[in-house]
Amino acid sequence: MSETATVGGGCFWCTEAAMKELAGVNTVTSGYAGGDIDNPTYKQVCSGTTDHAEVVQIEYDPTKIEYSELLEVFFATHDPTQLNRQGPDVGTQYRSIILTHTAEQRATAEAYIEALNDHYDDAIVTEIESLERFWSAEEYHQDYFEKNPSDAYCRMHAQPKVEKVRETFTEKLT
């Protein structure tokens, strides 16, 4: 049994690395969603002119991890109050976004954000939209943190997120 979740919380390398730590997650694919051109390239998305977001698509086993648990990790590993930026990455392609696949996912995401709002000084700006289209990113983006652990960006931004998942969500790890 497999279900799909799609989220974006800044650079997809970081979100991919964090989600891959979780038991019940079968695959995590970095890619692009939204936007107004088909099959965008990284260069096009980074230009900020296509309205795509960097996202990850997560195939998971709902008997081992629930959608709400994926949301818990998603919100713990990025700042949902930052509009169109995460850390050093600025632009609409780095926005906080949940792209739902079902009405149930949408309801869960809306309820989760409503409950979480009281825990932040600033309003949560995470967008919730129905997923219309997803394109896998170029191959060199897939498993980027795993393949490039000593990359300076990965050490500064992805590694702390992975460590947070390992320390905070020990019962959910692979």
From Swiss-Prot:
Keywords in alphabetical order: Oxidoreductase
MF-aspect GO terms: L-methionine:thioredoxin-disulfide S-oxidoreductase activity; peptide-methionine (S)-S-oxide reductase activity
Active site residues of this protein: 11
Stored InterPro entries: Met_Sox_Rdtase_MsrA_dom, Met_Sox_Rdtase_MsrA_sf
SUPFAM superfamilies reported in the protein's UniProt record: Peptide methionine sulfoxide reductase (SSF55068)
Presence of the UniProt keyword Oxidoreductase in the record: yes
Annotated function: Has an important function as a repair enzyme for proteins that have been inactivated by oxidation. Catalyzes the reversible oxidation-reduction of methionine sulfoxide in proteins to methionine.
Protein's name according to its UniProt entry: Peptide methionine sulfoxide reductase MsrA
Species this protein is from: Haloquadratum walsbyi (strain DSM 16790 / HBSQ001)
Gene giving rise to this polypeptide: msrA
